[in-house]
Amino acid sequence: MLKEFKEFALKGNMVDLAIGVIIGGAFGGLVNSIVNDIIMPIIGLITGGIDFSNMFIQLAGEPRATLAAAREAGATIAYGNFVTLLINFLIIAWVLFLVVKGMNRMKKKEEAKPEPEAPREEVLLTEIRDLLAKQKA
């Protein structure tokens, strides 16, 4: 049973998947930092100093100054957080699109490679076979 598990776990696809998940998690953290620490502050500066992480609509209770206070008081729609996550998603989707596009281009190049010429001996043997077939006919 241990041998079967070892064969299953060490198959190429399983290891590739595990590596992909680990790299994907690290990439997600990197994109999250880029969005939160670089892109959103620039967008905030362009839009007049708006802090998107604190943008919300309070649905119940008295108006609150911060998102945390509004959530404690009742229902809120945190659309600033949604905008941040949407930008995060779009960046990840764009990078994945580029990766898939690059992989497809590499596959097409591999498929487009011409078949190697048959060895000269094989060509001669084919010609001899064809001549013998004509003589019999």
UniProtKB/Swiss-Prot annotation:
Its subcellular locations are: Cell inner membrane
Q: Name one GO molecular function term.
A: mechanosensitive monoatomic ion channel activity
- Residue ranges spanning the membrane: these are 15-35, 38-58, 80-100
* Stored Gene3D superfamilies: Large-conductance mechanosensitive channel, MscL, domain 1
- Keyword Transmembrane helix present in the record's keywords: the answer is yes
GO CC, sorted alphabetically, is:
plasma membrane
User: Transport: is it a keyword of this entry?
Assistant: yes
Kindly give the SUPFAM superfamilies that the UniProt entry links to this protein: Gated mechanosensitive channel
Which keywords are on file for this protein?
A: Cell inner membrane, Cell membrane, Ion channel, Ion transport, Membrane, Transmembrane, Transmembrane helix, Transport
Q: What membrane topology does the annotation report for this chain?
A: Multi-pass membrane protein
HAMAP family reported for this sequence: MscL
> Which family does this protein fall into?
Belongs to the MscL family.
Quaternary assembly = Homopentamer.
Q: Its function?
A: Channel that opens in response to stretch forces in the membrane lipid bilayer. May participate in the regulation of osmotic pressure changes within the cell.
Protein name, entry field: Large-conductance mechanosensitive channel
Please report the organism this UniProt entry assigns to the protein.
Brucella anthropi (strain ATCC 49188 / DSM 6882 / CCUG 24695 / JCM 21032 / LMG 3331 / NBRC 15819 / NCTC 12168 / Alc 37)
